[in-house]
């Protein structure tokens, strides 16, 4: 591996226009006052870093639920999935992963399966680390059905700084575990609703790596009727 590969990561195409804008502002600031220009360069480098999209090595063993986001587990609780997905109104274990502005913000599919529903709902822009952000904030919800009929939901939630949720998938698509399904710009949160009876293998405060960290194990039981 080259040394540059350690420090320079691929950038997601969604970030190109933002890096271009930051770069143009940096050039303009150099004309005004050189120290301001260097601040602009720093901001441009940060923007590039924010939109980095490194490759991830996703565990391939059957029955694993993989973290959909980089960040820290902020909440683990029982909650009903978003009504707009049309899932059962039974409370499920919800694991929330909070992403700050320094985390990679490309989101990855936790399990292989077929997209059954994608639903966007406008809302507020509260601090994404708050419990009520799941209900009140702008969100994009995705339901994936696995081969055994069980379903899992991923919910992208906007936050104080994040004001744009981007989804790459639509209903009927087949996804592989670890496949990119979206991103959220500039700080946010992703909730995962586990199938009935499945318990998380992570705890609050644990650091997660999207597409790599095992969040839960489905096990042999609990198959859909």
UniProtKB/Swiss-Prot annotation:
Molecular function GO terms recorded: phosphatidylserine decarboxylase activity
Group of enzyme by EC: lyase
Residues that bear Pyruvic acid (Ser): 188
Localization (cell): Cell membrane
Active-site residues annotated for this sequence: 188
Gene Ontology biological process terms, A to Z: phosphatidylethanolamine biosynthetic process
UniProt keyword list: Cell membrane, Decarboxylase, Lipid biosynthesis, Lipid metabolism, Lyase, Membrane, Phospholipid biosynthesis, Phospholipid metabolism, Pyruvate, Zymogen
Cofactor remark: Binds 1 pyruvoyl group covalently per subunit.
Pathway(s) per entry: Phospholipid metabolism; phosphatidylethanolamine biosynthesis; phosphatidylethanolamine from CDP-diacylglycerol: step 2/2
E.C. designation(s): 4.1.1.65
Disulfide topology: none
Needed cofactors: pyruvate
Membrane topology reported for the UniProt record: Peripheral membrane protein
Domain of life, per lineage: Bacteria
Coiled coil: none
An example Gene Ontology CC term for this record: plasma membrane
Site-annotated residues for Cleavage (non-hydrolytic): 187-188
Protein's job: Catalyzes the formation of phosphatidylethanolamine (PtdEtn) from phosphatidylserine (PtdSer).
HAMAP family per the UniProt record, alphabetical: PS_decarb_PSD_A
Family membership noted in the UniProt record: Belongs to the phosphatidylserine decarboxylase family. PSD-A subfamily.
Protein name per UniProt: Phosphatidylserine decarboxylase proenzyme
Originating species: Dinoroseobacter shibae (strain DSM 16493 / NCIMB 14021 / DFL 12)
